Each structure stands twice: as C-alpha cells, then as structure tokens.
C-alpha cells in the first residue's frame, strides 16, 4: 500500500497537488470518485468496473444457450473501456514500478544468521528418531531395521507406552473423534478438559487448574499477562529459568530483576530494594533441566511472604517424578505428610500450599502433550478471562486430555516407576563418576555429562549414535552457555543394568577416542559447573534411601480411583 501511494504521489498530478486532509475529506463522499473519473487511467478503470456490475447483480439462474453465446461472444460483452493488465503495466508513463530505493536483503540476512550459527558450532541438526512403544526404550532411525537405544527422551517414566493411557486414548478417540473442534470459548470446552483440570487441581491440592496447548505457552501467557495488567509489577527471575519464562517476562514489559541461580542472598537483596507495596512476582523452577539442580522452594516462599511477592513455580521436569503421588518437588519436600494424607490435604501447612502458582507439563513424565497452571480459583479465572494464549487457541484433542487424566491417575497410585527411575539414575551416575566421566553433580534425575566444547559435544553424540547405536543429544548454546556444552542423559525405568552398562562402556570409549576431558582434567583447569571444583561438598539425592525402599502397599488407598469433584472454574464462575 505504501508503495502504491508513493507511486501515485509521483505520477498523478491530482494526488500530488492535493493535501492529505483534502483527500481524506473527499473520500468520505462521492466527490473523490467524481474527481477520479477525470483521470484517463482511473476513469477507464471505474467505467470498466461499473460495466461488469450488471453481470453480478441478483438474478435467477439460467442455462446459457448456444445461440445466446453466439450472439454475444465474450469479446463483445466487455466494456469499451476495458483494458488488459499487461497494457497498463507496459505503459511506462502510467506507473513506474521500479523503486529507486534499495530493498532490504532478506535472503542475505537469513544466510548471514545461519552462517554465524554454523561458525560457532551452535547450528542444530535434528536426528530422525522414531520411538517404538513395544520395544521401549528402543527406537529406529529413518530405516526401521536401524534401531538405537534412546537415552535422552523426556518421556521420563515411559508413560508413552502405558496401556492405561493408550487404551483410554483409543476409547475416547473412537467416540469423540480426533480434534476438539474449537477454542474453549467456541465448541472446544468439554468433559475431558473439565476432568483433566480437576485431576490437576487435586494433584497439586490447589483450588483450580487451567490446561494450555503446552507449558511453553502457559508460562509465556501467564507471565506476560501479569506484567501487562499489573502496573509497576517487578518480576524476579532465576538466571537459569527456561526460555518460555524468559519469553513471558520479556513480553510482559514489566521491570525484571534476574537473581543468581538458587542464590537466596542475592534474591533477598533485590527484593529489599522495593517497598512492600510494590507488586512483585518470583519466577523459578523446581528442577532445572540442563544441570539438574533443585530450587530451595521453601526458603523462596519465606522470602516471598516477607516481601509481599507472589510465587510462580515451574514444575515441568518434576511432575510425575517427585513426591509420593508425582505432584513434584513441592510435594516431595513434605513427603511423609502427603503419603499419609493421600488425596486429602495434610492437616499442617505444607510447601505445596504455600506456592501461589504451579505450572507443569503433560508431555514429559505423563507421556502425552500439553501444559497447565494451578492455583487459587480467582487467579485461574483471571487467566481464563484475559490470557490470549489460552483464549485464542484450539483446545487439545479429547483423546489427549483423557489419556493425560489416565496417566495422572496411574502415577498417583503407584511409586514403582519413580523408584525404578531413581534407582537407574543412581547406577549410571555412580558408575560414570567411578571411571572419571565428568557428571555435573546434582540431586535430581538428570545426568549431565560435561564436554565444554560445542564441536566435541556434537562429535561425541554422533559417535555414540553411529558406532554404538546409542542416542544422546548434545546440548549447546543458547540452551547452555558457551563453554558449558554437554551431553544430557535421562535414564528411565526401562534403562536397567544391562543397558546402563552398554552406555557406560560406550561413553568411556568415546571419551578416549575424542580425548575429552575427564574429572581429573577439569580439576587441573580449576573446575567447571561443579566438576573438579575444589571444596565442593557431596550432593545428596532428593529421593532418600528410605523413600526408595517404599512399596505401593505404603500408599494411602484413598488415592486409588478417588471421586474427584468437577471444578467449574474454567466454565466461568457464576455470581
């Protein structure tokens, strides 16, 4: 449009000599059309347009006859003012289509940006990995007979192959079809969404929940909404927060304070800079996925209460994995109390009910897809009413939501998958450390192996895949800082001692073949990320030996097929 305007201003005497105000005034009535008829080009175009109107007026449909076509061939039916497009384009005096200005070089820009990523070795290649449900944790590559063992999936508990989940998805898929049919506001609000949100609220022992298409969307939508709606809000963000949280904070346009990772002193120093009346929100994760560290949730809640801040806790890498029922690290911190009370809330205050908001995913430990947030009923209703990321997107398919509910119910009633996963994780960590492989120390289920160079990390990943049929993804910038590149290993209940020994032996060989730095080498360099650093105290796993000794007989029977009352918040709250 701007290009047409510029051309018109340069070639049309009428437009050139008229002010913008005059043109706007003329456009409000027929005067502009009258003036346009005096133009040799616009006049012809207007006459041609009007001459065709009789052919598009409302008439009864009739069948064309050969005689009518013969008496009125197409060429004679055209207006005498009609003209061919190529005639107008070819008239150099009419419109000059060649701009004298240089256009932006989009192609050059894109190629330059991609070239930079290739140069710094952060350009990403996606491996074709097709996980096999009946052979978990196996997968095949592009050819079905080319099978590998997957060691880096986020399907932490193997729920992607769980019969309860799959059967429920099949049942609902057959009855309700493949899609939801609309947004939650228009034809996409259904019993499956209500059931899933009720399950999630009960899991986290919060008043209500809201399901999003992914947790990236949930984090972005919620955090951006806070900043856009609450004047003078300050968001305090851990420096290792996930990209979805960073994006949400950026989109919020709120003032932000980034505090050092898990550093309570730094967080308090920043909180203390603002009056208690200033609205504040602390955004952090429970398990940080690339290093495996765990946040001091209880202490952060203490600071939030002291300085009048809301707490926003991302439990994406913890739901399903921690706590007696899989509600995450916040539940795990009061393990015995929640184990005893089951589906009910403990009589005493817990960390879980001190956290204002919890976001989580259905796409990792629960084996499906989607994200969610839980919290107070009025908070959830506010998100439902104002968050564009929720309002203007199609609802998850009914089968996905039903399968997710089945996964939550299953994991709530068993400890065995979590215990098996933690047991296998300890086995891998201990044996890798024993042979000097630099595992970044942490208390969680993540096994990050430090490489420290993007090219070497890619070579190690490729060698494991091509030579040993083991798939471990290399992690590089911007997911981790430059110089801290690593291999990220995530054992599951299916990675028992036999597969674990294969991985340990393969990594040992790869480190030798590529001359990668081991723990002793990192010690000589002064250490990095907790590997080879002096005065590093041993880190205890969050799952204790006593907890790993529990069985399903220790679970409160009230969690097995409990009657969970539907929560109607996402339908709208009646006055």
From Swiss-Prot:
Full protein name: 5-aminolevulinate synthase, mitochondrial
Residues engaged in binding substrate: 124, 237, 256, 479
Residue numbers of N6-(pyridoxal phosphate)lysine PTMs: 364
Subunit and interaction comment: Homodimer.
Compartment(s) of residence: Mitochondrion matrix
Gene that produces this protein: HEM1
Keyword Acyltransferase part of the UniProt annotation: yes
PROSITE patterns linked: AA_TRANSFER_CLASS_2
A Pfam entry, by short name: Aminotran_1_2
SUPFAM superfamilies associated with the record: PLP-dependent transferases (SSF53383)
Cofactor annotation: pyridoxal 5'-phosphate
EC number: 2.3.1.37
Cross-referenced InterPro entries: 4pyrrol_synth_NH2levulA_synth, Aminotrans_II_pyridoxalP_BS, Aminotransferase_I/II_large, AON_synthase_class-II, PyrdxlP-dep_Trfase, PyrdxlP-dep_Trfase_major, PyrdxlP-dep_Trfase_small
Keyword rRNA-binding tagged: no
Protein keywords: Acyltransferase, Heme biosynthesis, Mitochondrion, Pyridoxal phosphate, Transferase, Transit peptide
Species annotation: Debaryomyces hansenii (strain ATCC 36239 / CBS 767 / BCRC 21394 / JCM 1990 / NBRC 0083 / IGC 2968) (Yeast)
The protein's role, per its UniProt record: Catalyzes the synthesis of 5-aminolevulinate (ALA) from succinyl-CoA and glycine, the first and rate-limiting step in heme biosynthesis.
Major localisation: mitochondrion
Molecular function terms, GO-annotated: 5-aminolevulinate synthase activity; pyridoxal phosphate binding
